[in-house]
């Protein structure tokens, strides 16, 4: 137990230290903190000083100048005759940042987010080991290296709700896969309620988690599921009423100056869903905004999920469900994949599930293990490299990050497809890479995992757990995989 506590501490401080390396990096050449980030900080400042969401006085007094030297795009409109202005962003992140922003400004806010990212990494490691029975040593290495790589470390200090949402999601998974007690149900309600209040885009993954919880417990814990359903229903109604009352619409976008023709324009005026389907692979492979060029370890993402479904479907289905829902939102709902932000933003919320799946894969296959380690280390170096460039005014985190001089990124970008290019060469490159991933996936799921010769294996299965005992009288290897239903 003490050894595992040390591993948790190692992951915490590794995540925190790597995240802090970019704390002074510039988002753009005109601002340390830019785009949507100032909106969250101004709202946090208003909550700290005025105890309300109205940022009109903060905008008039240019309270953003310490972190945004240029004139700020206000993003909001007058909501009434008194000139009230409320940022078109959900309020839970500003509420979390209100205390650090009030006490220490933008720097304290970034530190608070970095600490929260470290906590998210710790919870992810705990879930991997305690809920999915991954080797503590391997899980520690995988979680540490991937939380220290983009995009996880990128959003550890950038002021967005992505990392708090990832914490809410992995906490929900920890609760759902454990015992269904009244305290656990209360905790799950809090975690799930937090997600939409961080951003309305997390409603689909919230619904997926809630439905899975009800499916898992409907027959065995009827009383708890009734209670859960009623409270979550009340929470949803309250969410809509409060948004209608404060923001003038069903979502925060009703107060935004970009959506004066309708709040649901946030997904696009005439979204071409067929064209957006290209993002299914683009989110992984795009030479600028994909996961793989920055952290090559994510080449293992699809093989990892395929392997977990094949080998441990019942246990890992929740991981895959969350990943599929989150990936679908990033593909078909998000306005764009190429935005004014660091790559992978829309995926951060579900990447803890991918990291756990990759840890399971690394435990079973040595080749994949070292690939994930080395690909993750490349991601760590990429971030440290760019953080130094962005801190010394040679590059920025959201304008020209793809012009970094980091050689491994540049080498991969040269051979990966550009999803802003609709020519045949980009399509061919996409097909080649997808074929490579498909081949790697097939080889992974068709290869039998090795069992040591000469050691008998006893396997005992019930509806809720699997117990494997393997070895001799002098040495036993016991593994227990549990899906609690009580």
Locate each region found by the language model.
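Transmembrane-helix motifs of polytopic, lipid-linked glycan transferases
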Residues: 108-133, 167, 171
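Short acidic/glycine- and proline-prone juxtamembrane loop motifs at membrane-interface regions
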Residues: 154-164, 290, 343
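Interfacial juxtamembrane loops and adjacent helix segments
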Residues: 49-101, 256-274
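Transmembrane-helix signature of polytopic, membrane-embedded enzymes
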Residues: 124-150, 166-167, 181-187
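Membrane-interface alpha helices of multi-pass inner-membrane proteins
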Residues: 44, 142-147, 175, 184-199, ...
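Membrane-lumen/periplasm interface segments of specific transmembrane helices
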Residues: 224-304, 313, 319-330, 378-399
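Hydrophobic, aromatic-rich transmembrane alpha-helices
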Residues: 121-122, 214-217, 291-317, 354-361, ...
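Perimembrane helix-loop-helix junctions
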Residues: 177-178, 204-237, 241, 302-312, ...
């Amino acid at each position: 137990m003490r050894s595992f506590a040390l591993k948790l501490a190692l992951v915490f401080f590794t995540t925190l230290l790597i995240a802090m390396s970019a704390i002074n990096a510039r988002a753009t050449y005109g601002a340390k903190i830019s785009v949507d980030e100032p909106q969250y900080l101004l709202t946090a400042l208003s909550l700290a000083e005025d105890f309300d969401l109205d940022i009109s006085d903060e905008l008039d007094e240019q309270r953003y100048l310490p972190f945004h030297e240029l004139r700020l795009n206000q993003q909001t409109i007058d909501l009434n005759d008194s000139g009230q202005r409320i940022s078109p962003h959900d309020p839970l992140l500003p509420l979390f940042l209100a205390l650090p922003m009030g006490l220490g400004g933008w720097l304290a806010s970034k530190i608070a987010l970095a600490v929260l990212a470290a906590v998210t990494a710790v919870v992810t490691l705990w879930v991997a080991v305690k809920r999915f029975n991954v080797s503590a040593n391997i899980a520690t290495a995988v979680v540490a290296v991937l939380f220290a790589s983009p995009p996880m470390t990128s959003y550890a200090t950038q002021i967005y709700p992505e990392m708090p949402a990832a914490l809410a999601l992995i906490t929900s998974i920890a609760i759902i896969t454990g015992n269904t007690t009244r305290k656990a149900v209360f905790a799950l309600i809090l975690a799930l309620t937090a997600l939409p209040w961080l951003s309305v885009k997390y409603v689909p993954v919230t619904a997926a988690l809630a439905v899975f919880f009800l499916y898992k417990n409907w027959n065995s814990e009827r009383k708890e599921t009734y209670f859960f359903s009623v409270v979550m229903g009340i929470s949803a109604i309250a969410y809509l009423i409060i948004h209608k009352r404060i923001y003038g619409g069903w979502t925060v976008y009703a107060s935004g100056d970009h959506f004066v023709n309708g709040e649901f324009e946030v997904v696009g005026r005439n979204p071409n869903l067929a064209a957006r389907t290209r993002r299914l692979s683009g989110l992984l492979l795009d030479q600028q905004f994909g996961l793989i060029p920055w952290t090559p370890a994510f080449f293992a993402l699809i093989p990892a999920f395929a392997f977990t479904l094949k080998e441990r479907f019942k246990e890992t289905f929740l991981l895959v469900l969350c990943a599929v829902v989150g990936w679908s939102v990033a593909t078909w709902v998000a306005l764009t994949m190429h935005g004014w932000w660091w790559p992978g933003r829309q995926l951060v919320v579900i990447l803890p599930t991918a990291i756990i799946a990759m840890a399971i894969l690394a435990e079973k296959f040595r080749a994949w293990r070292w690939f994930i380690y080395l690909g993750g280390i490349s991601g760590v170096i990429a971030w440290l490299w760019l953080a130094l460039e962005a801190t010394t005014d040679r590059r920025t985190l959201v304008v020209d990050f793809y012009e970094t001089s980091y050689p491994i990124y540049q080498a991969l970008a040269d051979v990966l497809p550009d999803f802003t290019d609709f020519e045949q060469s980009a399509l061919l490159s996409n097909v080649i890479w997808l074929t490579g991933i498909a081949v790697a996936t097939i080889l992974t799921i068709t290869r039998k995992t090795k069992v040591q010769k000469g050691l008998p294996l006893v396997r005992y299965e019930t509806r809720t757990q699997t117990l494997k005992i393997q070895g001799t009288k002098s040495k036993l290897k016991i593994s227990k995989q549990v899906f609690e239903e009580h």
